[in-house]
């Protein structure tokens, strides 16, 4: 199989990378009706598999889970999750031939084996669904001509997909139809109904492409979402301890600081996050972020280039074939880091202290978000897609670090994201070593000294923050989500 993106000519590549349209609410007036009365069989019962299935069932769809015979015989976790929630469970051979829509929600590295197992069992004219397009775009999986191939990609972990649905809302979602597999022209109707069944239409849906989803998703998770948080955690912890800060305090400031800082990001973008700082601290964070962007721009560009060319996927799939040797080695190295093993700290850190003592962390978030966004735009990805794959998902990833440090983040994200995270963070840490020696008092674990504020300089900084393109598109998208949430709650 050949990388699908690399088989396209330049015009086709640019067209698919740039596919992104914010869909209006009235396009979902039919909600999930197109799939009602049809059989939906989900393969995989992990976080996305279970929680999407629960939402779809609550939306009136007929849901069953197809598992491998050994998973059923051995009553594995996937079997227990499905049966304990009252779902029909059966083997591929028993359920797949009945399915009008087969939804593949297994991990990326299992996709080829799963698709090759289910495809011969699928009836003529059925549909195959994904929530991430890696198998189609990077692996280049060929699907039978009569099968419609669609994608519904919630921009949140599976648990969040369920919780937002239970609140009467949903999570922002990308949908797409594979242009090589839509013989009956019903792909968009299927994708819209599936998205509505998960609640995504109540939070905002982008009509995208498999290519745009994969390339932007890989870029976001490797750089700002995971790689930058991991590199920042390791660097900031080691710096504080070397400067004599109590290890427990340093660890807690980082572990819970990312979540606190990015909560402001979620509510009001980079503007609100920076507004949580004093004026001298804001000016210092801005200066630090500009330095960081200059240093790291080549690394962000390299990751984007390797994603676009397919080099990243080729390298990672070679590690799959080598029993994940690199992935498992890097995971072990991360687990042995000083930050992962810092002593518990019983003292209290106030919400504002996370900002006041985490000026460098704020700068890292700002630099990483803007660099990821700008680099995606330069590669032809549309602003809305770039926003969702950089700023929007960052608070969700930061929350995993707050739970159990980097270990939890790397367990929750996909193996694909984890592999890319290590590539980025292991390059970023040495790249920023010299920069870390230039830090001043107040950049970490102390307040920035108040040495006066230049009004004109502050004015220019505020204007630069607010006029960055991610702030402009972010304000629009957050406003839409807020409006939709009000409608959902009112209903």
Swiss-Prot record:
Tell me which Gene Ontology terms the entry assigns under biological process. Answer: isoleucine biosynthetic process; L-valine biosynthetic process
The annotation note on the cofactor reads: Binds 2 magnesium ions per subunit.
Q: Where is the KARI N-terminal Rossmann domain?
A: 17-208
**For the KARI C-terminal knotted domain, which residue ranges apply?**
209-344, 345-484
Origin superkingdom = Bacteria
User: Which controlled-vocabulary keywords does the entry list?
Assistant: Amino-acid biosynthesis, Branched-chain amino acid biosynthesis, Magnesium, Metal-binding, NADP, Oxidoreductase, Repeat
Annotated NADP(+) binding sites: 45-48, 68, 76, 78, 108-110, 158
Q: What is its EC number?
A: 1.1.1.86
Q: What Pfam families does the record point to? A: KARI_C, KARI_N
The pathway where this protein functions is: Amino-acid biosynthesis; L-isoleucine biosynthesis; L-isoleucine from 2-oxobutanoate: step 2/4; Amino-acid biosynthesis; L-valine biosynthesis; L-valine from pyruvate: step 2/4
Any idea which GO molecular function terms this record carries?
ketol-acid reductoisomerase activity; magnesium ion binding
Where substrate binds, per the record, is at 414
Q: List the disulfide bonds.
A: none
**Gene3D superfamilies from the xrefs?**
N-(1-d-carboxylethyl)-l-norvaline Dehydrogenase, domain 2 (1.10.1040.10), NAD(P)-binding Rossmann-like Domain (3.40.50.720)
Q: Which PANTHER family match?
A: KETOL-ACID REDUCTOISOMERASE, MITOCHONDRIAL
Q: What does this protein do?
A: Involved in the biosynthesis of branched-chain amino acids (BCAA). Catalyzes an alkyl-migration followed by a ketol-acid reduction of (S)-2-acetolactate (S2AL) to yield (R)-2,3-dihydroxy-isovalerate. In the isomerase reaction, S2AL is rearranged via a Mg-dependent methyl migration to produce 3-hydroxy-3-methyl-2-ketobutyrate (HMKB). In the reductase reaction, this 2-ketoacid undergoes a metal-dependent reduction by NADPH to yield (R)-2,3-dihydroxy-isovalerate.
Protein's UniProt name: Ketol-acid reductoisomerase (NADP(+))
Q: Which organism is it from?
A: Proteus mirabilis (strain HI4320)
- What are the leading ranks of the lineage? Bacteria, Pseudomonadati, Pseudomonadota, Gammaproteobacteria, Enterobacterales
Q: Which gene encodes it?
A: ilvC
